[in-house]
């Protein structure tokens, strides 16, 4: 009969960012424990607050099934001597397995016959195994940072205060550090800090709410959402949507309630992004806006308790925010005393990266790269691109960005407008940081896009030049994000800029800094971009269609993306399977291709002439379709070759004895394969 497992780890406040991952890791760890022990189980539930992590598993088997275990020993040739007597190797293996040598069996494997010890193992009770599993699970939760406390030889995110562990309502006995497991949990630290008994998950959830704890983060999130909307309505405003903040705050509290506070309207002269950043990043406050989206002088904060006098909480939060905003106002006013262009010189004293020089040197490189892009793609904005690139990093040495790094670029735009720069240049200063996250907003203007592309490419190529290449677990310079940003901007804008030329232009500007051969760096950078492009496209289209196109060429990202989309649509045809098989057959026969011209005089079968004629006609139509970037039409034309290809393979022996005839037939198939290759490598497609 299946039973339920319940585990709660109660501790001091865990950082909000640790909790969701710990919940996911607990699920993975218990699955690993049960799977390794051959214990069947059902639904797994994980919950978490700043003070507790909860794991509940339903339908856990009472015991392991009995098992027959086979341990492989030495090969037969080493296990017996010429007279058939067991050798020391066989005797030692039997002794190690705890059985007599006569009980060993011969097992036939792919490598030959081997000795094996086959033993029956009686399954153990789950209740007997859990005291070993659960402390191991607790100790294996991989927190980003963990700590020891007192003199105990265990680690956890924060010191543990209690552990409740139950299987079928009975305590699972074990110790972790100085804590013995039991059947009691505890309520809210400030509102009901008393122990209460736990029987199972359902009973636990009921008791928690009675003791002012909401263990389910999704329920807490919805409570917070409803609370901030209620309070915003009372304040005659609207909550500025911020799902990331909502997610974070839901892991900061156990029993949320919302209160409304205000700040002086005088602070509204400071750019709204600064005010929002100060409230969100530093205080975890939700901002309020009016019906037109204008920022209101108010905020909503989430409290972890229900207070008798909310105004006490409000006043405290208002006082803290007032100090923050006063600092912001001071920096804003002081920064206005120095023109943005005057700050550019200060970048010479800011080290961008030890091997790549200062921020000023970086600016000079990507300014030239941005001008090159503008010259090739929109020459009318060259001067604006040059100006925006010159100024776009200057706000890094301003007081405001020094205090609030999150508003870099935004303040550059504000200061540029204040100094009388063109609005297009000012906007490009802010846009050049875009996108700031996957799927985020992209630069709206060509000016901002060119500066953004140039800056990001210089970052990627610069790091690769000096060996700072991302690994599977580390990407300290966010090069993957920069590469995806470049790809998304190019695709969104439709820029037909060969990626290889763009990379080479960037590397030429970095030649003096490079510690690796530039040709090697270029190959690595292009491989890096190919990986990002393939991953991005594979989220939208079948992976084999993506690989089929990207393996041929992805230098023109816009063209490659369009070909992938066309190929993905083309493969939905009912006759795609047979088409793919025919195309693959051609490609497999002429893997390297034959460069000799096709001679009709060497044809010995009518099928050869028919295929040659069909290829000639289709090649022209495909070329026209490719010029128009109508890749679906090109694929449709190529598909018309199938009858002629099928007839050719039915009637003609490609590998003829006559060398000239054989080469002529291979040349004919090479023409077809190269026509396919103008779009994709069909050998990579699944029928």
UniProtKB/Swiss-Prot annotation:
Primary localization: cytoplasm
Keyword check for Protein biosynthesis: yes
InterPro entries: DALR_anticod-bd, Gly-tRNA-synth_bsu, Gly-tRNA-synth_heterodimer
Reaction(s) catalysed (UniProt annotation): tRNA(Gly) + glycine + ATP = glycyl-tRNA(Gly) + AMP + diphosphate
Compartments, record wording: Cytoplasm
Domain of life: Bacteria
Family: Belongs to the class-II aminoacyl-tRNA synthetase family.
Oligomer and partners: Tetramer of two alpha and two beta subunits.
Designated name of the protein: Glycine--tRNA ligase beta subunit
Protein's organism: Geobacter sp. (strain M21)
Source species taxonomy: Bacteria, Pseudomonadati, Thermodesulfobacteriota, Desulfuromonadia, Geobacterales
Gene transcribed to yield this protein: glyS
């Amino acid at each position: 009969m299946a039973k339920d497992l319940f585990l709660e780890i109660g501790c001091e406040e865990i950082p909000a960012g640790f909790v969701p991952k710990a919940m996911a890791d607990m699920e993975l760890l218990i699955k690993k424990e049960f799977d390794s022990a051959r214990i069947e189980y059902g639904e797994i539930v994980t919950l978490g607050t700043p003070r507790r992590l909860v794991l509940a598993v339903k339908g856990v088997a009472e015991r392991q099934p009995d098992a027959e275990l086979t341990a492989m020993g030495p090969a037969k040739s080493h296990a017996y001597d010429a007279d058939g007597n067991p050798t020391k190797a066989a005797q030692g293996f039997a002794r190690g397995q705890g059985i007599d040598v006569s009980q060993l069996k011969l097992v036939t494997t792919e490598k030959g016959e081997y000795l094996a010890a086959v033993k029956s193992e009686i399954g153990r009770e789950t209740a007997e195994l859990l005291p070993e599993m659960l402390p191991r699970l607790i100790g294996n939760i991989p927190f980003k940072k963990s700590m020891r406390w007192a003199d105990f030889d265990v680690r956890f995110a924060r010191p543990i205060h209690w552990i409740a562990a139950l299987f079928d309502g009975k305590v699972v006995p074990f110790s972790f550090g100085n804590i013995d497991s039991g059947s009691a949990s505890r309520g809210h630290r400030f509102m009901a800090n008393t122990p209460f008994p736990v029987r199972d998950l359902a009973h636990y959830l009921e008791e928690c709410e009675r003791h002012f704890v909401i263990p389910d983060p999704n329920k807490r999130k919805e409570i917070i959402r409803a609370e901030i909307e209620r309070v915003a309505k009372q304040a005659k405003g609207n909550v500025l949507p911020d799902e990331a903040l909502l997610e974070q705050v839901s892991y900061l509290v156990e029993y949320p309630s919302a209160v409304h506070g205000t700040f002086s309207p005088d602070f509204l002269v400071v750019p709204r992004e600064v005010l929002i950043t100060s409230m969100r990043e530093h205080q975890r406050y939700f901002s309020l806006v009016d019906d037109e989206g204008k920022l209101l002088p108010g905020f909503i904060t989430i409290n972890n308790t229900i207070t008798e006098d909310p105004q006490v909480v409000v006043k405290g939060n208002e006082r803290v925010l007032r100090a923050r905003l006063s600092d912001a106002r001071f920096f804003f006013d002081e920064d206005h005393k120095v023109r943005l262009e005057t700050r550019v010189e200060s970048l010479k004293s800011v080290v961008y990266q030890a091997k790549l020089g200062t921020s000023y040197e970086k600016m000079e490189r990507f300014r030239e790269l941005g001008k090159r892009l503008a010259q090739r793609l929109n020459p009318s904005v060259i001067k604006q691109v040059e100006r925006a690139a010159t100024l776009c990093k200057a706000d890094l040495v301003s007081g405001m960005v020094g205090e609030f790094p999150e508003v870099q670029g935004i303040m550059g735009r504000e200061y540029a407008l204040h100094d009388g720069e063109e609005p297009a240049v000012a906007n490009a200063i802010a846009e050049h940081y875009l996108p700031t996250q996957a799927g985020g907003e992209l630069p709206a203007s060509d000016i901002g896009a060119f500066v953004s592309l140039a800056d990001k490419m210089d970052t990627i190529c610069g790091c690769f030049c000096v060996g700072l290449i991302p690994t599977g677990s580390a990407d300290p310079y966010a090069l993957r994000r920069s590469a995806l940003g470049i790809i998304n901007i190019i695709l969104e804008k439709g820029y037909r800029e060969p990626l290889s030329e763009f990379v080479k232009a960037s590397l030429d500007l970095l030649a003096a800094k490079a510690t690796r051969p530039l040709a090697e760096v270029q190959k690595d950078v292009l491989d890096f971009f190919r990986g990002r492009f393939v991953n991005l496209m594979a989220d939208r289209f079948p992976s084999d269609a993506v690989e089929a196109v990207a393996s041929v060429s992805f230098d023109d990202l816009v063209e490659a993306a369009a070909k992938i989309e066309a190929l993905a649509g083309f493969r939905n045809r009912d006759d795609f399977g047979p088409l793919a098989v025919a195309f693959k057959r051609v490609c497999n026969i002429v893997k390297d291709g034959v460069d000799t011209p096709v001679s009709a005089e060497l044809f010995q079968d009518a099928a050869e002439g028919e295929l040659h004629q069909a290829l000639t006609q289709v090649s022209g139509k495909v070329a026209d379709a490719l010029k128009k970037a109508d890749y679906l039409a090109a694929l449709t034309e190529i598909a018309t070759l199938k009858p002629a290809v099928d007839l050719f393979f039915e009637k003609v022996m490609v590998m003829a004895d006559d060398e000239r005839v054989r080469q002529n037939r291979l040349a004919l198939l090479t023409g077809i394969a190269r026509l396919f290759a103008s779009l994709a490598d069909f050998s990579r497609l699944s029928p």
